[in-house]
Amino acid sequence: MLDVHPSGFYAWLQQPHSQRHQADLRLTEQIKQFWLESGCVYGYRKIHLDLRDSGQQCGVNRVWRLMKRVGIKAQVGYRSPRARKGEASIVSPNRLQRQFNPDAPDESWVTDITYIRTHEGWLYLAVVVDLFSRKIIGWSIQSRMTKDIVLNALLMAVWRRNPQKQVLVHSDQGSQYTSHEWQSFLKSHGLEGSMSRRGNCHDNAVAESFFQLLKRERIKKKIYGTREEARSDIFDYIEMFYNSKRRHGSSEQMSPTEYENQYYQRLGSV
């Protein structure tokens, strides 16, 4: 059941259905949907941002008014996870320099971490993306944001691709990436590190773009009761849809796998 006051909600429903009132009804349904997707913790400011991102044009005061009218409010005491502050041990220069379209696979990879809400708690996802095809070549999901999550994602990428030449691996300056373990892994596998400038998310725009797609096309449409449900659904999105089927404008409207296959077919015919 929603934490909504029935008397206020049903009294409001019985008002004359003016054009404005009908628009408010539709908007309130969207507000309730975003509120549910947040685990019932979002207030009017965050829900306004979700509405804006979905293409809905409305003022923040209108969202506040409608939420107050039907009794929807944020649940306090439930905060988003914060990245732990670690010592910035080793920071690599920004060697990628926003060169997001290499000429071949396994020239440049980008990596990043995001978090997913479940009723059991937070779940963290690290991915490695090949910039040539936008394919997710490595990923790892854990309930804690430790160094292992980024190392496991990169290990999967190395195992799957087995690059025969040095690959540039770009990340932000999160503590997982500035650790000695990360730098040691890069060196031992013949990889070269690159990092975004501090506080500049556009330096890692492709990884950010994938997370936006994942959340818009899958996560925001679901409410995960358990971490295992989320893991299974994210596996399905990455391996069964995104890599093999999802078309990309940057890849001539082909999926990442199709785009790479076409590249190797052309290479073999030369």
What are these regions (language model features)?
Residues M1-V270:
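Charged DNA-binding/catalytic regions of mobile-element recombinases
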